[in-house]
């Protein structure tokens, strides 16, 4: 039998052997060739109260990095920006798909809409919420150098299944602050002069929508998908009417927005 001294020697040898095999990583040659995971900011409404929104986003099957409350427009951070949250789902923008992995999700407490016998009623955002959102966008965009084209709504990246943040969302005000795009009214007016005379073919609308960032197939047909994508574009840039019809005003706005690269 081994005595105590021999047992101690064996234990020491095993310990030293383990140390000798320990993984050592040399960090003296860092690469400059990388960028941030975060390329997009996706904006949503919750279609729920604050309490319900917090419960859904922290214990449900969806999540976001930030939530802006109502009443006092408190900004809640629900997840570290290093992590992927589950807010975008099946999505695409400018050729990039499944944006959960490359975006920061911001939810805003807002009921969304309700349907009445006379039509759908949408809910506005409060001034406090808009100011809180602008401050948050400035903070995030500055740190990650987000391209204004990549600040989008859920309806932009998933137009077949989502309507948020809705037609009352203040996209123009965000764009004026540098967060997003908004077409110059004079440029739209000039472009419309041509389209008032003759509308372009459906394939042209599809091509311009793709240039603007929307996921759409060039079928040349006014199919269900094309109507949904047109409606998403209209809801973003012409919220007074978003019926998915390829009219002259839509063509003019689309031409200008698609050219804002």
Residue ranges and their predicted role:
Residues 146-161:
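Acidic/histidine-rich, metal-coordinating catalytic segments
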Residues 21-149:
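Active-site-adjacent loop/helix surface patches within enzyme catalytic domains
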Residues 195-257:
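Short acidic, glycine/serine/threonine-rich helix-capping segments at coil-helix boundaries
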Residues 17-18:
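C-terminal motif of bacterial Sec signal peptides marking the signal peptidase cleavage site
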Residues 1-8:
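Bacterial N-terminal signal peptides that target proteins for export
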Residues 92-95, 117-128, 158-161, 191-198, ...:
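Second-shell loop/turn segments in exported
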Residues 61, 70, 128-139, 169, ...:
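Extracytoplasmic/secreted proteins, especially bacterial periplasmic and envelope-associated proteins
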Residues 33, 67, 167-190:
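Acidic, His- and aromatic-enriched active-site or binding-groove loops in soluble protein domains
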